[in-house]
């Protein structure tokens, strides 16, 4: 049996992220065999991960990447959640999030479910995440996933502070001409949280719900019935300006809309996505 030295304990702790007592127990059980000790830690951790699954995991970070394709570019964004920001900002957690993003790109995944089934070395992303939960001692899960494609894809990653990893990632796909204002549009998406690109993209049931609310509100305010339809249309237009990207006032110059930015350069936006840590379950 190999001597269980402080150096050995340090090595296993650095490689696994497990606590000192857990490492000592694993090394003792493995009779000083480092590889076997790591296996023990992983096995025990995966079993414990099931107990953590019921716990809230709404902290975390987002990794993003743009890759070239035959038709232009594709952007990917993957949110990885933890229970605390203490874990989320550790270099190992950020590094693991980047690894998961890499698996998404390699598999050309189209959803979080596809990503979980993708290969991660000699295992799957789902199992790799369960192992990570064991190492970090918290419930860890893949959260939101976004993928968009276009002639050009711009990505902006927003951090709350310099020492924290990204908490918001905004991506926008444009044609070649639109690339000139894509960065400004990505900043807008991050700051203002548009939900749809054009008003035609807003689901009919959402529009009808807003129309009913606006009608009931106008009548409750005692507005003359004959002018209610005009008031309702005005309120619907205000709603569209809030939730439709191309109709939002541009944050740097509210005298124009985001759509105006693209008109000025003769370009078009074709798709966008916004991922914010902890917002997936709320929405």
Curated annotation (Swiss-Prot):
Molecular function per GO: translation elongation factor activity
Alphabetic keyword roster: Cytoplasm, Elongation factor, Protein biosynthesis
Gene Ontology CC annotation, any one: cytoplasm
Xref: InterPro entries: EF-Ts_dimer_sf, Transl_elong_EFTs/EF1B, Transl_elong_EFTs/EF1B_dimer, Transl_elong_Ts_CS, UBA-like_sf
Keyword Plastid carried by entry: no
Pfam families recorded: EF_TS
Annotated segments matching region Involved in Mg(2+) ion dislocation from EF-Tu: 84-87
Keyword set includes Protein biosynthesis: yes
Highest taxon above the source species: Bacteria
Family annotation (CDD domains): UBA_EF-Ts
Subcellular location: Cytoplasm
HAMAP family for this protein: EF_Ts
Described purpose of this protein according to its UniProt entry: Associates with the EF-Tu.GDP complex and induces the exchange of GDP to GTP. It remains bound to the aminoacyl-tRNA.EF-Tu.GTP complex up to the GTP hydrolysis stage on the ribosome.
Family to which the UniProt record says this protein belongs: Belongs to the EF-Ts family.
Protein name (record): Elongation factor Ts
Gene, per the UniProt record: tsf
